[in-house]
Amino acid sequence: MSDIGDWFRSIPTITRYWFAATVAVPLVGKLGLISPAYFFLWPEAFLYRFQIWRPITATFYFPVGPGTGFLYLVNLYFLYQYSTRLETGAFDGRPADYLFMLLFNWICIVITGLAMDMQLLMIPLIMSVLYVWAQLNRDMIVSFWFGTRFKACYLPWVILGFNYIIGGSVINELIGNLVGHLYFFLMFRYPMDLGGRNFLSTPQFLYRWLPSRRGGVSGFGVPPASMRRAADQNGGGGRHNWGQGFRLGDQ
């Protein structure tokens, strides 16, 4: 048990709380401590009965059963893997900026969920984070099952198809990818490549709550230092030297 505790404490803070909630809320529903009916994002209950917790619980809840258990575990792995990589990579030392990214993506997903009657938001939020990581590491070569290798920029779409095969919904993954693209476009692509203004800015109260642990933040519309160094070394193309790809299931 001490090994599990040490591993859990080694997870970066924001990812650790997100991971724990995504385990705890389905467990509470599975044990019947609270009816899962209270966890879904039902527009009528949220908008007219003022059950304001539903957007939060719908983000963490997933109905785990014989037909959905593998899909749940795979996406829980994606949450741990890519949220950890972002929080300790592009957002290293900047927890407020990382939390703001999650909040921005979450708000967009909640609005979309209410408009499209999406009752569960766990997979879209995970996919949005995975998409941002894939774009920041777009030329890294990653390995997937059966020895397939491809650039990271294609990973969100490969996983979209993979989740569909194992019982997921294309809509959930697609919404997550689109929200991740919106964040990446507004924070990086539009200011950097198109010379536009910065539309996203982390609120100051988040910096007061979660101060940066080191100076020289990347800032919105400016690529992280690792991204800039890789671009300089590779002339803007080729395989980035930001770490090794991984095979799904590797530790």
From Swiss-Prot:
Homotetramer. The four subunits of the tetramer are arranged in a twofold symmetry. Forms homo- and heterooligomers with DERL2 and DERL3; binding to DERL3 is poorer than that between DERL2 and DERL3. Interacts (via SHP-box motif) with VCP. Interacts with AMFR, SELENOS, SEL1L, SELENOK and SYVN1, as well as with SEL1L-SYVN1 and VCP-SELENOS protein complexes; this interaction is weaker than that observed between DERL2 and these complexes. Interacts with NGLY1 and YOD1. Does not bind to EDEM1. Interacts with DNAJB9. Interacts with RNF103. Interacts with HM13. One of its GO terms (biological process) is endoplasmic reticulum unfolded protein response. Pfam families: DER1 (PF04511). It comes from the Eukaryota. The keyword Hydrolase does not apply. The modification N-acetylserine is found at residue 2. The lineage of its organism: Eukaryota, Metazoa, Chordata, Craniata, Vertebrata. This is Derlin-1. It is found in: Endoplasmic reticulum membrane. Residues 229-251 are annotated as: Disordered. Keywords: Acetylation, Endoplasmic reticulum, Membrane, Phosphoprotein, Protein transport, Transmembrane, Transmembrane helix, Transport, Unfolded protein response. Belongs to the derlin family.
